[in-house]
Amino acid sequence: MVIMEIKDLIGEATEYDKKQQLEVKKPKSWCKSVSAFANTLGGSLIFGISDSGEALGLDDAEGDAERISETIKSRLDPIPEFKLQFHNEKGKMLIVLDIFKGEDTPYYYSGDGVLEAYVRMEMKVLKQHLRS
């Protein structure tokens, strides 16, 4: 079992979420975090790691990175600035998705017939209540 030092992956980012795998059929599960990071101070999503910090790896990291990029571009409005990086942890391939603090807030998740914005508060992702 490979337990990771998260700070080695995300550097200066103080906010992050860990995902064991990319949820292709349920992109809202991780797109909420992308919206929340863009609407607040930015942050990182690490794919291929357990909640306890164990490096599990991804079977198709390159394909997953492409799907992440396409999903962000098709499901978030406006499209937030982000960066994808690969990280090899003792033979286990991980993806680190850095989402930068947005200038054009709010950043909405669009899918499942809804348009929702999220924010990050105390390590939790919350739906943002917007005034009309």
Regions found by a protein language model. Name each.
Residues 1-132:
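Conserved N-terminal catalytic/coupling substructures associated with nucleotide/phosphate chemistry
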